[in-house]
Amino acid sequence: MRLIPLQTSEQVSRWAARHIVERINRFQPTADRPFVLGLPTGGTPLQTYKELIRLYQAGEVSFQHVVTFNMDEYVGLPKEHPQSYHTFMYRNFFDHIDIQPQNINILNGNTEDHDAECRRYEEKIKSYGKIHLFMGGVGVDGHIAFNEPASSLGSRTRIKTLTEDTLIANSRFFDNDITKVPKYALTVGVATLLDAEEVMLLITGYNKALALQACVEGSVNHMWTVSALQLHKRGIVVCDEPATQELKVKTVKYFTQLETQAIQSVL
C-alpha cells in the first residue's frame, strides 16, 4: 500500500486529480477501449472534482471515452432530489465535463427489485472487464462506500442498512434532521472495490484519524472495512496532516521519505 501524507486537504485534492488525469492519459482510451473510473460522493472528493473540471477546461484531459461507476445511492430518494447522489454527481462533476451520458452508471435506488438492480450493476462492471481506478472516501467509522462496520470483506453490490453514526453524519445534508436521511442504500461491496485494478482513498481531517490508523497500522478486520485495502496489490491512501494524528510518528516519517517525489509534486 502507498500512503501519501500531504499537509492540506487542498493538496490531497490536487494530487488525486492529477493522478486520475495521468492514469486516463496514459491509458489512451477509445470508444472501443474506454477507461473505467469508480467514483464516490460526499464532502471529501468535492475539491478533487473541482480540480478535475479545471484540468478538463485547461485541455489536459478528456472524459469522452471514460466510463464511470458510482459507489452507492440512497434507497427511496428520487433521482431529482437535491441530496440524491445522481444530483450530486451531475451538479458537481458530470455537467461540467465532456463525458457521454450513456457512459455514466449510478445505482437506481428506486427500483422495485433491489437484488436484481445490484446483480445488474455487477454484471455491467464485468462487461467492461474491470474498473481501472476506483476513487473513494472513508467514513469516520472506517466504512468505504456504504460498507458499514461488520460488513463482509467478500461482499458484492447489495442493499445495506445505514448505521446511526452514518445517519448522524449525513444529516448535515438534510437540514440536520436525522429523520430525513434515508435508512437504506445500495452500495458496491468490499470485494467489488478490491476487484478494481487500483484503489485510491482520500482521507482528510482530524475526525478520520482513527480510520486512517485502522487502514494503515491496524489488522484487516470487518469492523474497519477500510482495512481491506491492505489486501490490494495497488492501494493508495492520500491524506492530509490532521488525519495522521493517530498514526505512529515513525509511520508518517517512513512514508514521507518513501513518497518524497509525490509530496513535492503538489508543493
Swiss-Prot record:
InterPro entries: Glc/Gal-6P_isomerase, Glucosamine6P_isomerase, Glucosamine6P_isomerase_CS, NagB/RpiA_transferase-like. It comes from the Bacteria. Pfam families: Glucosamine_iso. The record marks S151, R158, K160, T161, Y254 as: Part of the allosteric site. GO terms for molecular function: glucosamine-6-phosphate deaminase activity; identical protein binding. Belongs to the glucosamine/galactosamine-6-phosphate isomerase family. NagB subfamily. Catalyzes the reversible isomerization-deamination of glucosamine 6-phosphate (GlcN6P) to form fructose 6-phosphate (Fru6P) and ammonium ion. NCBIfam families: nagB. This is Glucosamine-6-phosphate deaminase. It comes from Actinobacillus pleuropneumoniae serotype 5b (strain L20). The lineage of its organism: Bacteria, Pseudomonadati, Pseudomonadota, Gammaproteobacteria, Pasteurellales.
